[in-house]
């Protein structure tokens, strides 16, 4: 990675990811690096991560203070790298860490008040995982995390995620949903933090499914091992079997089910607005499953590459944006009550 001159100036998400990997490798393998290797890694972080990040504008639509997953990923990755080289470059590292502590709350506020995440299941896992990595890195270094785990709805978000799972093994795939990995290590962290055996059991069941399809394993699966811990509970805080659950906020959502078994009924429906990162014209839509069949579904994301090839304005969420001419993002692709063809 050091040999690559540019880690992603024009797609800063790549720099956030690279910074995380380099920071972990530098810190965890510190005694294995030679003096020259350490210096090369430090210089790459300073030049290709920190210096580049200082050129990012902080205005509208920027990830710097954005309310979407890029904020968590970029600040999280950069801060892990900063903590790794803190002893050598304390001033440079301090700037990155304090900036993250100031900016990440803009993303953390989208969980208010009950934990629902506007960007959907896929980007919940992505953004939330990086915020948790930032929290854990800060705790390890400083003994605190600037209160980044205390924002309203952030810890409750574990229930939101578990309620997205239907009874037949499918998720409620609203917004730009990518059906991805079976396991989500961040749920093991929530289980540990909340003392929730139901969350832990849910993640363990997902890991067991990997025996049948190992290609669906999360690239961060080693955190399942690091965040697992024995949980003793009397069951009083177990919520995974709730038959009704709802969340207010930027994207209100609700779920009901007759039970959690395969043949039982499950319905999920959402409100909110398409005018948000990865949004679809799906406000008021629903999904429904019963007798082991999902009768009403959400198709999830359209291929970004196909949308770019069609020259659609992929990240424009205005009413008349060409983004909505793609079928999967449009009202036509969702289960909506409509009047005169308008949602």
For the regions a language model picked out, list residue spans one by one.
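Glycine-centered flexibility sites
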Residues: 76-77, 115, 252, 292, ...
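Aromatic-lined, polymer-binding surfaces characteristic
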Residues: 1-170, 177-178
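Catalytic core of carbohydrate-active enzymes
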Residues: 266-343
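General N-terminal targeting signals
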Residues: 46, 50, 109-112, 134, ...
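Carbohydrate-active enzyme catalytic cores, enriched for enzymes
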Residues: 85, 123-295
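Sparse, context-dependent recognition of short Cys/His-centered cofactor- or disulfide-binding micro-motifs
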Residues: 14, 18, 63-66, 70, ...
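Replace the tail clause
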Residues: 32, 36, 245, 326
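Short, charged N-terminal helix-start/capping segments
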Residues: 37-70, 189, 196-219, 291, ...
């Amino acid at each position: 990675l050091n040999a690559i001159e540019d880690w992603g100036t024009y797609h800063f998400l790549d720099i956030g990811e690279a910074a995380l990997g380099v920071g972990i490798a530098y810190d965890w393998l510190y005694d294995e690096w030679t003096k020259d290797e350490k210096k090369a890694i430090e210089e790459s972080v300073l030049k290709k991560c920190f210096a580049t990040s200082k050129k990012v504008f902080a205005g509208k639509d920027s990830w710097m203070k954005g309310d979407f997953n890029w904020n968590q990923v970029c600040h999280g990755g950069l801060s892990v790298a900063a903590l790794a080289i803190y002893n050598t470059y304390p001033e440079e590292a301090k700037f990155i860490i304090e900036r993250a502590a100031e900016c990440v709350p803009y993303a953390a506020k989208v969980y208010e008040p009950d934990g629902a995440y506007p960007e959907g299941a896929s980007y919940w896992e992505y953004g939330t995982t990086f915020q948790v990595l930032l929290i854990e890195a800060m705790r390890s270094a400083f003994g605190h995390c600037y209160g980044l785990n205390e924002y309203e709805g952030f810890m409750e978000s574990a229930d939101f995620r578990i309620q997205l799972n239907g009874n037949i093994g499918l998720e409620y795939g609203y917004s730009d949903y990518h059906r991805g990995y079976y396991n989500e290590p961040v749920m093991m962290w929530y289980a540990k933090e909340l003392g929730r055996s139901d969350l832990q059991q849910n993640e363990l069941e997902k890991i067991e499914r990997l025996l049948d399809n190992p290609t669906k394993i999360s690239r961060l699966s080693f955190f399942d091992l690091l965040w697992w811990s024995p949980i003793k509970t009397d069951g009083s805080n177990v919520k995974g079997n709730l038959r009704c659950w709802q969340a207010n906020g930027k994207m209100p959502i609700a779920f009901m089910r007759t039970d959690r078994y395969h043949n039982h009924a499950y319905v999920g429906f959402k409100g909110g607005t398409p005018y948000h990162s990865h949004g679809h014209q799906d406000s008021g839509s629903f999904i429904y499953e019963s007798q082991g069949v999902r009768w009403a579904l959400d198709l999830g994301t359209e291929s970004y590459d196909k949308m770019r090839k069609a020259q659609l304005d992929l990240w424009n969420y205005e009413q008349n944006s060409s983004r909505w001419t793609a079928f999967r993002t449009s009202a036509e692709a969702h289960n909506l009550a409509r009047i005169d063809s308008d949602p």
